[in-house]
Regions:
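Intrinsically disordered, low-structural-confidence terminal and linker regions
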Residues: 1-3
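Sensory/regulatory domains in signal-transduction proteins
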Residues: 5, 10-18, 25-163
Length: 163
């Protein structure tokens, strides 16, 4: 059962980690990969992946490290080249809070905090308001799946997303 939030022309859907991949639409194969890296109930770690795992999605992956302490924040560890083209700049090394209002909303912060606690994942879609390409802002839609990662299998310390 998913939880759905609509805000700022975006739809955010949260799913339990055990949701079958086929319930993830066009992201089924990415969810299947994430599931294949899990060990029982544990979450996969970033170190469980090999570059070859992402061959079908090169350029569309981003990975964020969760920063310790409060308030909640992340920093982009990996920002795909196709994302750089779409956004108009490389966001590698940029903090989530630095992108608040342009890329991330309050809803993103709230949902990610919940993902850390519950190990749920989310699928989101909406207009490309953030795009560097002016023509995309009204015509293009973006969708992505975002999944938690944990070096110890339990404490979420990263997010991996496919756009």
């Amino acid at each position: 059962m998913s939880a759905r939030v609509e805000a700022d022309d975006w739809v955010y859907e949260m799913f339990p980690k055990d949701t079958p991949p086929d319930a993830c639409g066009s992201f089924a194969s990415f969810k299947r990969l994430w599931d294949s890296k899990r060990k029982g109930e544990a979450l996969p770690a970033w170190k469980d992946y090999q570059l070859e795992d992402f061959a079908d999605w090169y350029g569309w992956i981003n990975v964020e490290d969760i920063m310790p302490g409060e308030p909640f924040d992340t920093v982009q560890r990996l920002w795909g080249t196709n994302l750089t083209t779409a956004f108009g700049k490389d966001q590698t090394g940029v903090r989530m809070r630095e992108m608040k209002g342009s890329v991330y909303s309050d809803t993103d912060f709230d949902m990610r905090t919940k993902m850390v606690e519950t190990h749920d994942f989310r699928i989101c879609y909406g207009p490309a308001n953030w795009s560097a390409q002016e023509s995309w802002k009204k015509t293009q839609k973006q969708s992505y799946i975002e999944l938690p990662l944990a070096d110890d299998g339990h404490t979420v310390d990263k997010f991996i997303a496919l756009t």
